[in-house]
Structure formats: C-alpha cells, structure tokens
Regions:
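Aromatic-residue-lined binding/catalytic grooves and analogous aromatic/hydrophobic interfacial grooves
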Residues: 181
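Loop-centered beta-sheet repeat module
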Residues: 226-229, 234-246
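Conserved Rossmann-fold dehydrogenase catalytic segment
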Residues: 217-230, 263-264
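Bacterial N-terminal signal peptides
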Residues: 31-41
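N-terminal secretory signal peptides that target proteins for export/translocation
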Residues: 1-26
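Extended, subdomain-level signal for the structured scaffold at the beginning of enzyme domains
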Residues: 44-177, 185-189, 219, 240-401
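A conserved active-site-flanking secondary-structure segment within enzyme catalytic domains
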Residues: 194-220
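Glycine- and other small-residue-rich loops at beta-strand/loop junctions that grip anionic moieties
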Residues: 89, 197, 227, 231-234, ...
Length: 401
C-alpha cells in the first residue's frame, strides 16, 4: 500500500471530507459511508496483524541488526557534515520533518538545511506550514558534492519522481539516507532498501513486506542502521534516531546534553512492536470521534519569533490526530516567523483579525519538549477521553504513554 492510499497516517482525508461537505445531511451521509469503510478496514487490519504474529521477525532476529549508527567520516574537507531534511511541498509529515532538523541544529554539530522539492510553501501534515530554506535545486547548486546525511520524512506522494530521482542522486554521491516513519516508503520506492534490513511504521509494515520482498523487515527496533541507510518506526522515533545521529556525528556527550534538554533519558533502539496494533477499541474511537462532527473543534496555538518548534510540532501533531480537533497557529501578524532553530513558519491566522479557535492553548512553559507531549496527551485524555489519547499515542507509536 502506497502512502498516498487511505490509511490512518495519511493526511486526514476524513476531516477534510467533512470540511468540503457543508450541510448536516451531507455530513450524515459521509458518516454512514465512513462506518462501512472503517468496518472493512478493521477486518483487513486484524487479518494482517494475525499474520504478523505468526510470521513477523521476533526479538532474537532483531538482535543481529546494528545497534549504533556508524560514526561520521568527514568528506570534501568539511569540518562538520551537511544534513538535508527534505520534504515534498505538497504535504509532508510535521514531526518527521521538524524534529530531525531541530535536534541536529540544536546540537551545533552539523550544517542542517530544511529543504523542499520546490521553493514555495510546504504544507505539513496534520497541521502547520513552513517555507523551506532551500529547494532541492538551490541546495544542489550550493552543495554539488551532495549532502552527508539526507533525512526523508513521510510525504503524501511517496512515489514522487522528483523526490525519488533526487534521493537516488544523493545516495550515489555517498549520502547516508534516513527514512523516518512512512518516509521508509520513499526510500524503498527509490530502490535503496534492496538487500537491506529495515523497519517502519507499525501500520505499514505488512504492506511494506508484501511490496518490497527483497528487504528484511525487522520489528522490535525503533530505528535500524544497515550500511548507508537508516529506517525508523513511526513519528516519535524521530527523537531517538536524531539523538543517535548526533552521537554518530559529535559523540555521546553531545547527544546526552541535547537529550537532557529534550527531557529524554536515552535513545536506545529497543522497542516492543507488539504493543502497537489496531484493536476494536481503536476502531470504535476513530469512528465515534469522526461521526461526532458537531463537536469537532479547532485548537489555537499562539506563535511568535523564537518559538520552540519541537514543542510546537509535538503538540500540534498530537491535537490534530484526535479525529475531534485540529491545531491552528495564531500570530500577531501574517509575517513569517523564525522559530528557535531557524525554521520559517507561516502563521495560519492573525490575532484579532481572523476567526478565533474554539480553544486557545496557554503559552509553552520552560518544560522539556517531551514533557510537553506527555502533558498534551494528558490534556487530550481530559477533554476527549483516555481512549482518544491512547489512539493518538498509538498512531505516534509513542511507547511512554
């Protein structure tokens, strides 16, 4: 299954459908249609998961995979590596994109660039939008030798010819390619996982196994390094893999410093994949939240220059996956906002000018970024119920909840 097909991790087609059908009558018709879709989908998923329990690689099998990302080796006389975090302007997963960029930038161990397939606005899923620092064309002009590391987040068009061609050229120049979450689809479609060990988002693994049979798909690891290719599980695995990259580039002490700032105790790849699976309860939560369109609401997040984009990404991502709420950024003006680590954020709305949100979150405090995610999940549980918070943690593949 390609990332462009309907699944719970692709752009929120369900919520977008409701926005496009204005009348209650039309919305009710869509709701009943969704009931059938979810019922069919749940049967398919449960069947796939039963197969996984029988045929999926176990912990013992995963032990033979490299535990550490190979240490950085300088090329082209560079004093530190060039890292390209590349997304598709049409739609790219928010946290997959922002966290690797921000963690590596914060570490001051690499020259990191947020780039897009072109120079226009990049829509981030499930919320927010930015203007990339470079397009792939301008990046190539600036660094004709290529990047040392290329981070590939989940994108809506995982078979984009432009993205696949560019990724292959970077790999041919010696770049290490990191597929984060469903960014693994892009890496696999580029042919870079042939004969490799890899992992991926729990919901996608069965489909990845079926389509890419020449790849050894491994469970129970949040990230896997095999030669010059690294792959991860779902969204929140962007945190440990980014810290592992910092360690590979600048050493464990530097990685530990950044980890403490984020509120992370370690970045070990060990993982219990069996915890993450779609259940009847999960399907019921999705369905009941989706059809309760009268209680859908917007969550306003105030942003200003210097905003912590890691906290912003984690909070906006979580609130926009409840199937009850959508995060929207508010600023004092429509001007582009430069975040703490240099991303160019484009506000969704302007205070006092545009429609207000149903709820406005308080400003971020000084708590570490991962603490902000924990607090957000607790808030989601209070507002929408614990089952909704558990579903959000499931989709984020967040083991700490």
């Amino acid at each position: 299954m390609k990332a462009t097909q309907f699944n719970f991790h692709s752009p929120v087609l369900v919520l977008e459908t409701f926005r496009k059908f204005g009348t209650r009558f039309a919305q009710l018709r869509i709701a009943f249609l969704l009931l059938g879709i979810v019922a069919i989908l749940s049967c398919s998923v449960f069947a796939d998961q039963r197969q996984t329990e029988i045929t999926g690689p176990d912990r013992k099998d995963a032990i033979h995979v490299s535990e550490k990302i190979p240490a950085y080796q300088s090329r082209f006389g560079r004093t530190r590596p060039v890292v390209a975090v590349v997304g598709d302007n049409y739609m790219t997963e928010l946290t997959d994109y922002v966290i690797p960029y921000s963690v590596l930038t914060r570490s001051q161990s690499a020259d990191v660039f947020a780039i897009g397939t072109d120079s226009g606005i990049m829509n981030l899923y499930p919320a927010l939008k930015i203007r990339p620092q470079e397009s792939i064309a301008s990046f190539d002009s600036r660094f004709p030798e290529g990047a040392d590391y290329v981070v590939v987040p989940a994108v809506h068009h995982s078979d984009s010819p432009v993205l696949l061609h560019w990724l292959n050229r970077q790999a041919s120049k010696g770049a290490t390619v990191i597929g984060v979450c469903d960014g693994v689809w892009v890496v696999a479609n580029a042919g870079l996982l042939k004969g490799k060990k890899a992992t991926g988002f729990w919901y996608s693994l069965n489909d990845l196994e079926k389509k890419f049979k020449d790849t050894k798909w491994v469970r129970n690891r949040r990230y896997i390094a095999d030669g010059n290719v690294i792959t991860t599980t779902a969204v929140t695995a962007s945190i440990p893999v980014s810290l592992a990259l910092v360690e590979a580039i600048a050493g464990k002490d530097r990685a530990s410093k950044v980890a403490r700032e984020l509120g992370v105790s370690d970045w070990n790849p060990a993982h219990d994949s069996n915890r993450f699976r779609l259940t009847i309860g999960s399907v019921y939560t999705i369905l009941s939240n989706t059809v309760s369109f009268w209680s859908h609401e917007e969550i306003g997040i105030g942003v200003a220059p210097g905003v912590d984009e890691i906290k912003l990404a984690l909070v906006a991502d979580a609130y926009s996956r409840t199937y009850r709420s959508q995060a929207v950024s508010f600023a004092a003006s429509q001007d582009t906002i430069r975040t703490a680590n240099g991303l160019n954020l484009i506000p969704d709305r302007v205070f006092g000018k545009d429609d207000v949100a149903d709820r406005m979150l308080v400003e971020f405090d000084s708590a570490p970024a991962v603490t902000a995610l924990d607090q957000t999940l607790s808030q989601i549980a209070e507002i929408y119920g614990r089952s909704t918070a558990a579903f959000v943690a499931l989709i984020l593949e967040y083991p700490q909840y």
